[in-house]
Amino acid sequence: MKVKTNNRRDFLKKTVVAGTAASVPYFFSSQKTLASETRAKNDRIPIGLIGAGGMGVGNMVAAKEYVDVVAIADVDKDRCESSNKKLSGGKADIYSDYQEILERDDIKILHIATPDHWHTKPLIEAMLAGKDVYCEKPLTLTIDEGKLIRKVQKETGRIVQVGTQQRSTFNLFAKAVAMVADGRVGKIKRVQCAIGGGPRSPEIPVADVPENLDWDRWLGPAPKVDYRHIPNANKKGRGKSNCHYEFRWWYEYSGGKLTDWGAHHVDIANWALKVNGQTEGPISIGGRAEHPVEYENGYAVQNDRYNTATKFNFVVKYPGAVEMVIRDDTDNGILIEGDKGRIFVNRRRLAGKPVEDLADNPLDKSAIQKVYKGLPMEHNARKQHWANFLHCHREQIEPISDVHSHMEMLNICHLAGISARFGRELKWDNANEQIVGDDQANAFLARPYREGYEIEMRQTANS
């Protein structure tokens, strides 16, 4: 990873504002909600949106009662214009270069909803420009990018919420974690994450770049390649490409299902392990994976179709004979297995004998809020995750999906991807974040940044 350094000292110093979350009853009846804060202070928050695709627009709609979208940046002109109409009635300023938003003093918070390979660079530069950020998951394309993000966050003190909104689903995922914390499954021995397999594609031919798209800037830090697209047989939908949405299925821009859905379910699994006392990180990861193309030395031998894993089963081993399984088959969800019982949770249900036992032995009313860092709880998952971020922005306190816990779990997803590409088990030094005895695999902890798209670092004011 290439980092460019200069001597500009124009970012805001770290600000620490004392504040504690209000004590609130069980579930959604917060005494101090973000909505009431907004009404009382009469100061809706101006926000800049970087990446105007489906997630970015959807999240802004979810947060519309709290924020005003005043600036939008995207390399796709059509997306800029359509999102501007939907989110601000055409009143927001639109840019092709997100750096112009970073330079605006009237914007204190940002939402980054770009493709995965474009998360790290604007996030770091936003923190250094003094902005608090809600960034979509997965936060990084590599493990080393996560090291840099954590370093900059500590130095700047900026508030960063990661878009793993399952943490804010109180009646399912957060409740499952609260049950684990309350000892309802005993000591965890194994946790299984079923995230579904990845898609295949036919050969996707080189195509003309759409006039509305700046393809070079869309690629950004990634290697320069041709734009590819093939329409669906029925001529409906977006077709298949190496661009919008479909970027998920190319290792050059994402990690496939391992970092797409893995960033959700592995996050909850890791959260459960932490509240269960599993303080030590993983020591190895290995298993099997199938790809739609052949691989040599960790790289796909074909560049004209999807290349991320379609089927997989990985076992992550921890000290104390604890395991995490990441698999493509079975029902999508998380199975938490302890020595006293087991529970299954996904976005539709929470089940298991310990769940049934809640009828006669319910959780304490404060149980869920304890695992939710004592923060206010008020909305459905998507709105609540935004409410949490904006509350933490106002109070300058750590949000529920902070960069440090996120990278703990995302490292697991990245290691699974590296193991898949080489087809072998990896030994992991968690303290130093290095693969042990495998220089070839270790090289995949980072990625080169294309010239002109390096991360702009700014020295801290006290350096």
Each model region followed by its residue ranges:
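N-terminal Rossmann-like NAD(P) cofactor-binding module of classical short-chain dehydrogenase/reductase
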Residues: I109-H111
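NAD(P)-dependent dehydrogenases' Rossmann-like dinucleotide-binding region
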Residues: G51, R184-P202, D214-D216, G220-R228, ...
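Basic phosphate/pyrophosphate-binding loop/patch that engages nucleotide-derived ligands
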Residues: V152-R158, A174-K189, G197, A207-V209
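N-terminal Rossmann-like dinucleotide-binding module
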Residues: A18-S88, R167-T169, A269
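Rossmann-like dinucleotide-binding domain that binds NAD(P)(H)
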Residues: D216-P319
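N-terminal secretory signal peptides and thylakoid transit peptides that target proteins
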Residues: K2-G19
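C-terminal helical cap and adjacent loop that interface with cofactors, partners, or active-site loops
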Residues: K14-S23, F27, L34-A35, K236, ...
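Beta-strand-loop-alpha-helix segment that lines the small-molecule cofactor/substrate pocket
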Residues: P115-D116, T120-S168, G183
